[in-house]
UniProtKB/Swiss-Prot annotation:
Molecular functions per Gene Ontology: glutamate-1-semialdehyde 2,1-aminomutase activity; pyridoxal phosphate binding; transaminase activity
Keywords in alphabetical order: Cytoplasm, Isomerase, Porphyrin biosynthesis, Pyridoxal phosphate
Enzyme class: isomerase
Protein name: Glutamate-1-semialdehyde 2,1-aminomutase
EC number(s) per entry: 5.4.3.8
Catalytic activity: (S)-4-amino-5-oxopentanoate = 5-aminolevulinate
Length: 427
C-alpha cells in the first residue's frame, strides 16, 4: 500500500471525500490522489519522495514557483510581528496601491480571503448599485461556490437558471441567466428579455474552468457595449487570469475595461487572498462608505498582504511576464507537434501563463459544447501516464494548466520527452 493510498483512506474517515476541495480527489481521472510533502520551484515532492514537474501550481497562485525566497522572507518577517490584528495595516494600503497601478480599471479595491468572496461581494455590490436583481453568467464559467453562481442553463434557448448543486434554492437560481460563452447573440437575447432587470454580467475573460477557452475576437468588447446599452455593471472575473494572462490581467491583454474586477490566486502569492475593485463611483457604495455590506475577520491579513505584495513586486520586474508567456508557448507548441507526429487528434489553447489540452478531432475548441465533445477517457490515460513519468498535470480534463517562472527550458524538455512516449502509447 502506497503512503498516498493509506493517507487517502485515513482522510476519508474525517474529511468528506478525503479532500478539502473536490477536484483534488482525482474523481475526474480515477485513481488515488498524490499527497504532497513539500514543493520547491517547479517541483512537487510526494510523501514517498517522488518528484513531479508541477503544471498545477496550487491551481494558479504559484506564478513565481513554489517556496520563492522573496515571498518566504516576506511571510516570515511579517509573521514575527503577529499573525492577525483585525485592524488596518500599512501593508494592505501598499498592496491596494500596487494593484491599482497594475490594473488601470481599478480605482479602489477591497481585500477579502478568497475568490468566491470576491465574486459574491462584487455581485452584491452591483445589485446594490443598480437596485436590480438578475445577473448574467456563462455556462462552463466558474465564479466560486456562492449560491447565485452555482447555476446551470435550463432547457431552451434562454431560460431562468437551474441550481447546479443541491442546497441552492430555485428562488436564488431564478435570478441568474445563463448564456453561451463566445456567443454574443445569446447575451443580446437575455438583455432583450429583461432590459431593466439585469444588475450585472460576470465573465471569465479566458474561461479557465472548462479548461482554457480564450474569448473570440470582439466578444468581450461586445459584452462591454451591451452592459453600457442596458445599464448593467460589467464584471470581469480575473481570479484565474489576473496578473497571469498579462501583468494588467486579461482585460489589458484584450483591450477591454470592466466596471468591476475580481481577483484571487496570484494576488496572494500562495496565501488565501481575494479582492474586488473597480470604478470609484461604484466602490463607494460598499460599507462603511455606502449601504452595501461586506466584511471579513481575516480580510487584509498582514501575512497574506505581505505575500501578495512580494509576489506582485517580483512579477512586475522587466521581462518576467514575457518569459512566462514564452515558456507557456514553448510547452504548448511542443505538445501539439508531438501529438501530430504520432497522429493523435489534439488541440492546445494557450494565452499568457495558462494552457489547455484537448483530445479531439475538432480543429478548434472555443465553446462549452466543443469542450464537452472532447475525449475525456483519452485525457485520463494521458494524465496517468504522464504522472507515472513525473509530470503533474491538472487531474481533470476541464481544468487549465499553469506555467511558472520557475519552469526552466530543461523542465519543459523533460515534459516533452515524457509526452513523446505517452503519445506513442495513445496512437
Amino acid at each position: 500500500m502506497t503512503t498516498s493510498l493509506s493517507l487517502f483512506q485515513r482522510a476519508q474517515h474525517r474529511i468528506p471525500g478525503g479532500v478539502n476541495s473536490p477536484v483534488r480527489a482525482f474523481k475526474g481521472v480515477g485513481g488515488t490522489p498524490i499527497f504532497i510533502e513539500k514543493a520547491q520551484g517547479a517541483y512537487l515532492y510526494d510523501t514517498e519522495g517522488n518528484q513531479y514537474i508541477d503544471y498545477v501550481g496550487s491551481w494558479g497562485p504559484m506564478i513565481l514557483g513554489h517556496n520563492h525566497p522573496t515571498i518566504l522572507d516576506a511571510v516570515i518577517s511579517t509573521a514575527q510581528n503577529g499573525l492577525s490584528f483585525g485592524a488596518p495595516t500599512a501593508l494592505e494600503i501598499e498592496l491596494a496601491e500596487l494593484v491599482c497601478s497594475l490594473v488601470p480599471s481599478i480605482d479602489m479595491v477591497r481585500m477579502v480571503s478568497s475568490g468566491t468572496e470576491a465574486t459574491m461581494s462584487a455581485i452584491r455590490l452591483a445589485r446594490g448599485y443598480t437596485k436590480r436583481d438578475k445577473i448574467i453568467k456563462f455556462e462552463g464559467c466558474y465564479h466560486g461556490h456562492a449560491d447565485s453562481l452555482l447555476v446551470k442553463a435550463g432547457s431552451g434557448a434562454l431560460t431562468l437558471g437551474q441550481p447546479s448543486s443541491p442546497g441552492v434554492p430555485a428562488d436564488f437560481a431564478k435570478h441568474t441567466l445563463t448564456c453561451t460563452y463566445n456567443d454574443l447573440d445569446s447575451v443580446k437575447h437575455a438583455f432583450e428579455q429583461y432590459p431593466n432587470e439585469i444588475a450585472c454580467l460576470i465573465v471569465e475573460p479566458v474561461a479557465g474552468n472548462m479548461n482554457c477557452i480564450p474569448p473570440q475576437e470582439g466578444f468581450l468588447q461586445g459584452l462591454r457595449a451591451l452592459c453600457d446599452q442596458y445599464g448593467a455593471v460589467f464584471i470581469i472575473d480575473e481570479v484565474m487570469t489576473g496578473f497571469r494572462v498579462a501583468l494588467g490581467g486579461a482585460q489589458t491583454y484584450y483591450g477591454v475595461t470592466p466596471d468591476l474586477t475580481c481577483l484571487g490566486k496570484v494576488i496572494g502569492g500562495g496565501m488565501p487572498v481575494g479582492a474586488f475593485g473597480g470604478k470609484k463611483a461604484i466602490m463607494q457604495h460598499i460599507a462603511p462608505l455606502g449601504p452595501v455590506y461586506q466584511a471579513g475577520t481575516l480580510s487584509g491579513n498582514p501575512i497574506a498582504m505581505a505575500a501578495g505584495l512580494a509576489c506582485l513586486t517580483e512579477l512586475k520586474k522587466a521581462g518576467n511576464a514575457q518569459r512566462l508567456a514564452q515558456q507557456t508557448e514553448k510547452l504548448a507548441l511542443g505538445l501539439k507537434a508531438l501529438a501530430d507526429k504520432h497522429h493523435v487528434p489534439f488541440v492546445v489553447n494557450y494565452v499568457g501563463g495558462m494552457f489547455g489540452i484537448f483530445f479531439t478531432e475538432q480543429k478548434t475548441v472555443s465553446s462549452y459544447q466543443a469542450v464537452m465533445a472532447c475525449d475525456t477517457e483519452k485525457f485520463n490515460r494521458f494524465f496517468h501516464a504522464m504522472l507515472a513519468q513525473g509530470i503533474y498535470l491538472a487531474p481533470s480534463a476541464f481544468e487549465a494548466g499553469f506555467m511558472s517562472l520557475a519552469h526552466s527550458d530543461q523542465d519543459i524538455e523533460r515534459t516533452l520527452q515524457a509526452a513523446d512516449q505517452v503519445f506513442s502509447q495513445l496512437a
